[in-house]
Amino acid sequence: MNKPRLFIDSDVILDLVLQREAHFEFAQKLFAQYQQGKCVLYSSSIVLANMHFIIRKLHDITIANSSILFVNKHFKIIDANNHDIENALQSKFSDFEDGVQYFSALRSKKIDALVTRNVKDYKHALLPVFTPKQW
C-alpha cells in the first residue's frame, strides 16, 4: 500500500517547529505519523523562505536556520515555476502564496492531499484539503 503524500502548509510546519500551544498537538501527531512511516511529507521552497522570515523576526537567525534544516531533512521540497505563478494569478485563490503552493503541488503529481489550518483558502482546490486535526 502506498503511503499518502501530504503537502504541509507553512502554518502547520510553524506550529510544529515553534511548538505553538494552540495547534502543536495536532501538528505533532501528524509528524508522528511520518516518523512511523505512515505518510510522506512535502512542502515548498516558498514555505521555507516564509518560515525563515517569520522565525527570524520572532526569535533569531540561529533558530530560523535550525528550523529550516529540520524541514529540509524530513520533508520533500517542491519548487514553483512560471506556470504555477501564472496559474495562481489567474485563479480564484484570494491568497497568492496559497495559489502558488497549490499549483506547485498539483503540477508535481506527487501530492495526495493538502494539510493546512486555512482550509477556507483552498475551497476551489481539486486536491483533498484537511486540517491537521482532520488528518
For each predicted feature, which ranges?
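Short amphipathic alpha-helical segments and helix-helix/interface helices
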Residues: 28-31, 68, 101-102
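Anionic, Ser/Thr-rich low-complexity intrinsically disordered regions
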Residues: 43-47, 64-77, 118, 123-135
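Active-site neighborhoods of divalent-metal-dependent phosphate/nucleic-acid chemistry enzymes
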Residues: 73-117
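Short, well-structured N-terminal submotif of metal-dependent ribonuclease cores
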Residues: 1-42, 56-63, 133-135
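Alpha-helix capping/helix-boundary segments
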Residues: 12, 47, 84, 101, ...
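Structured helix-beta-strand junction loops
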Residues: 37-38, 74, 91, 125
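Acidic, PIN/NYN-like endoribonuclease modules and their adjacent C-terminal/linker elements
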Residues: 1-5, 103-135
